[in-house]
């Protein structure tokens, strides 16, 4: 079985092949996320503590967290599950995955070092690989370099050197800083707030004008109604007087 061991503190990882079954026996029947000592791998691993993070069997099927079996099963997976990437929106598919329990049928077991031991492991803990990309958000850059709000973040952005071309000057590349507060940003914010106040004022004026017009229309309608009532009562009185005069 091969062991893919990574050390996040240095950014390194190493693939070692272990043929001795006795060295691998402590890993058997352990689940993903289980932590155990790596002393069984040899004297140079004394004091190291590793966490099981996953693995693949001999046919290439991955281990899946939460499947409490040591064998292979077929599960109906969607976009919220690991071990499957849907090609269409809402697509589900039945895929073969291996359970989260380690056994001898695995070809690769992934381990993460969570505690360093006494000795350095060549190619794993004795060198550091710098991160290729630095933080992009302004608040993350401030946190990384312990800056205050008055400091200019643009001077501290992590630049990435580009490979040199023959006969040309060496260049570097920097990411666009997100959420950076500049005078232009503040000006846009003031413009947005002014536009919002203008809309509120216009809406209030329109509402007052509409209320005034509605009251005027209701008053006119009421006057017309009263006028109709008066005219109806007047015509009714005239007809009564005409009928009495004929008699």
From Swiss-Prot:
Transmembrane segments: none annotated. It holds the Pfam family Ribosomal_S6e. Residues 217-247 have a biased composition (Basic and acidic residues). Ribosomal protein S6 is the major substrate of protein kinases in eukaryote ribosomes. GO terms for biological process: translation. The lineage of its organism: Eukaryota, Metazoa, Spiralia, Lophotrochozoa, Mollusca. Component of the 40S small ribosomal subunit. Plays an important role in controlling cell growth and proliferation through the selective translation of particular classes of mRNA. The gene is RPS6. GO terms for molecular function: structural constituent of ribosome. Residues 194-247 are annotated as: Disordered. This is Small ribosomal subunit protein eS6. The keyword tRNA-binding does not apply. GO terms for cellular component: ribonucleoprotein complex; ribosome. SMART domains: Ribosomal_S6e. It comes from Aplysia californica (California sea hare). It comes from the Eukaryota.
